[in-house]
Amino acid sequence: FLSDFQVIRLFRACGCVKTKGISVEFLFAYILGNAFRSSSFYMQQRMQELRGCFSKNTYYRFLANPHVNWLHFTTRLAVRIIEQFLKPLTSENRRECFVIDDSLYERAGYKRTELAARVFDHVSMRYKKGFRLLTLGWTDGASFLPVNSVLLSSTKDENILGKRCSFDHRTLSHKRQEMACEKATTV
């Protein structure tokens, strides 16, 4: 997967560069493989089953790197998968379209979660604590591929329950924070 779709090249184009220590390829392959394991990084470390030769600081610093544009990365990776893998399998008669889904993402420990808010759930017709997960996906009627997703908070300050961290206005983190407080129609 990593070599077929040139994932590491895409990753570097989206701002991820490591100068020393463990390579980006190894760390990203481990994180990607973690999605298919039965336990998280924390539980692997606690049970002494950790297969990586890096510290937890390296792992979490890599995921929280403010210079990596994850939104751009997932979009470019989805385009590459669609163009190289899914389109050749799709017949000319089949129509392709984008699907936008707005789901509730409940968060129990909301007090320490940045920008957690009271969000209205249209299914139960009640306010719940958490986020709205806005997902853009591509489909040809038989297969579905998520292209992008954004966690949205509330546009009203009185509905925001979690703390709001301050970031440098030039960073991607600040832009993501501003995007989270916008309406879903403008995102």
What is the meaning of each model-derived region?
Residues 1-187:
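Conserved, well-structured functional cores that handle cations and Mg-NTP chemistry
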